[in-house]
Regions:
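Short, structured surface patches at the beginning of a domain
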Residues: 1-148, 152
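Amphipathic alpha-helical coiled-coil segments
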Residues: 144, 152-163
Length: 163
């Protein structure tokens, strides 16, 4: 049985990158391929790149695709260069975490930034549990908003083609 992490690399770029889309896709695809090339514990499944002005997670086609792949078990590790790529604000970040923590199978999150590094695999200082508690507390306060967000996200997932 393969116990390696199945990695989905995620990048969210501003709309202005549309002009240089091919170069951006090539660069980020190469970055992730190189990052996981010799990692025996992690296998890169796909790189998901959104070039959009949309801040909301459910309006980003590749993020929706990535979350659908997490839900169906194709990906169990979301890797992003920065936390900011994952979510534009605290609300979306907490909703995203809650959605991931609610999945029946474990999905980890790792970011590569020094300032706000997330690594739920290494779990330094019990980071995974702390993030889970943060997400649960936030979504309990904004339960109705979270449920509406989740419904929108899952509706968008039904439109996603398999990669």
């Amino acid at each position: 049985m393969d116990h390696r992490h199945k990695v989905g690399g995620y990048v969210k770029l501003a709309k202005l990158w549309e002009r240089s889309k091919d170069a951006a896709v090539a660069y980020h695809s190469s970055y992730y391929a190189e990052k996981f090339r010799d990692d025996a514990d992690k296998r890169l499944v796909s790189v998901y790149i959104d070039i959009t002005g949309n801040k909301e997670i459910y309006k980003r086609p590749e993020m929706v695709h990535l979350l659908k792949d997490c839900k169906n078990g194709s990906v169990n590790l979301i890797f992003s260069q920065t936390r900011a790529y994952l979510a534009a604000n605290t609300c979306d970040f907490c909703f995203l975490l809650q959605y991931l923590f609610d999945m029946p199978m474990r999905v980890d999150v790792v970011t590569d930034d020094d300032d706000q590094r997330i690594d739920t695999i290494l779990d330094v200082d019990n980071q995974r549990q702390s993030l889970k508690e943060l997400a649960e507390k936030y979504t309990s306060i904004r339960r109705k908003d979270y449920l509406e967000w989740r419904i929108r996200l899952e509706h968008e997932m039904t439109k996603v083609e398999e990669k």
